Amino acid sequence: MNAPQKHSAPITVEVALGDRAYEIVIGRDVIASLGERIAKLRPGARTAIVTDRTVAKTWLKRTEEVLDQAGIAHASVIVGEGESSKSYAGLEQVCEALIAAKIERNDLVIALGGGVIGDLAGFSASLLRRGVDFVQVPTSLLAQVDSSVGGKTGINSPQGKNLIGTFHQPVLVLADTAILDTLSPRQFRAGYAEVAKYGALGDEAFFAWLEANHAELFSGGAAREHAVATSCRAKAAIVARDERETGDRALLNLGHTFGHALEAATGFSDRLFHGEGVAIGMVLAAEFSAERGMMPATDAERLAKHLAEVGLPTRLQDIAGFTQEGLADADRLMALMAQDKKVKRGELTFILMEGIGRAVIASKVEPAPVRDFLQRKLAQA
């Protein structure tokens, strides 16, 4: 893989979806162009900024300033932080606030935040007046490389993650890499799991580049922009081929079947961030694949080694409160995986691996070997 160049101008990645195509604009301080871009996209539109309390303290004023400079009217909706806001109550709060702000069909909702805000604001926009367009301004690494791109929106159910939702594409994504400087180390690491996922599922050269360059990526600079852009290009290409996840878009769920079950078992709490669940889930998927003879055990070890090297959890035992009831229970985890979105007619579908850079969709996976695998992993505590 070629070394990244220093970018004096933003990088633009197109999501090619015909008359619903949109741009992902990546670079430092691209948020400064938000007002100008909205004015061109939707002249005369009013906006409502949906964000959470933490992001509001740092980025709401800046966002309002760039909208003011472009003469764009704006309201704001502030919700609590974390997965608890991705709920029926959170959806009601946002929808009612948008209605109170008199947001109409020709106006825009702005999702200013991480993956939770993007999912919640996008879902609310998709429902409001049967569909209002929205703009993604992702403020976490995870959101910039994954959840802000592709149009998946939704909330969680007590029975599982992202079970209530819609496909609703944004009209613009602004990925300001300067915003990532304000993330905690743990938040940044969690987002990095999704970056590594793109290499693990379909680009061994990118994975090797990450192994060699992750230190520079974590410290900022051109490597960070290169990683975000490479990740977005990978996702944009898959979304353009399979917008509604009827085929190979499911590959993007590498690590998510195990990971979502672990998130649900931990109550969608700060005990396990989404990216951390994905990291553990990818390692479990790789190890399960190796046990089935699908990939070399050395590749599974390589994946686990790299994720651990950057500080991500890679084992069930790395989760806080691991021994609490509901987590160290193979049957409970199997029941949660049975609610996975990829389940068809009650049969499990996993994203497994044939090697680094070669993920595959495995349909009709028998539950007994999965349960046995989990029981053995749990017994290693």
From Swiss-Prot:
Record has Amino-acid biosynthesis as a keyword: yes
Which cofactors are reported in the record for this sequence?
A: Co(2+); Zn(2+); NAD(+)
**Pathway(s):** Metabolic intermediate biosynthesis; chorismate biosynthesis; chorismate from D-erythrose 4-phosphate and phosphoenolpyruvate: step 2/7
**Principal place where this protein is found?**
cytoplasm
Quote the catalytic activity from the record.
7-phospho-2-dehydro-3-deoxy-D-arabino-heptonate = 3-dehydroquinate + phosphate
One GO BP on record is:
aromatic amino acid family biosynthetic process
What is stated as this protein's family in its record?
A: Belongs to the sugar phosphate cyclases superfamily. Dehydroquinate synthase family.
Q: What is this protein called?
A: 3-dehydroquinate synthase
Gene that specifies this protein: aroB
